[in-house]
Amino acid sequence: MKLCVIIIASLMVASVSGRLRKIKGTELDKKMLLEKLGHGMDIRFEETPRECSKKAGEKCESNCDCCGYSTLCGYITEGKEVKYQCMSKTSNNEILNTIGLGMNAIENMFSFCFR
């Protein structure tokens, strides 16, 4: 009986220590991978206008150009030509327009224009 308990205890100790070694090995692999990735990464930020300069209906290049919380730089197709302009109205229906303005405001918030 004592031999059985000793064998079971030694197997449990061996399995726990093996798992701990495996966990430490994967943590080291992750650290090495992050270090390798970190050396080759080059982050560049695109310069955007600090203040809005366009009103609704004027030509634009990005959401940061357009003034207003719910005004975005959208596109309109005229024939085969695509024109970008500031716009805020999304629908003729008042309820859908209100929902669209809210969605435009959220999209404009994620444009990260620092004004």
UniProtKB/Swiss-Prot annotation:
Expressed by the venom gland. This is U31-theraphotoxin-Cg1b. Probable ion channel inhibitor. Belongs to the neurotoxin 03 (Tx2) family. 02 subfamily. GO terms for cellular component: extracellular region. It comes from the Eukaryota. GO terms for molecular function: ion channel regulator activity; toxin activity. It comes from Chilobrachys guangxiensis (Chinese earth tiger tarantula). It is found in: Secreted. Residues 1-18 form the signal peptide. Disulfide bonds join C52-C67, C60-C73, C64-C113, C66-C86. Keywords: Disulfide bond, Ion channel impairing toxin, Knottin, Secreted, Signal, Toxin. Residues 19-51 form a propeptide. The presence of a 'disulfide through disulfide knot' structurally defines this protein as a knottin.
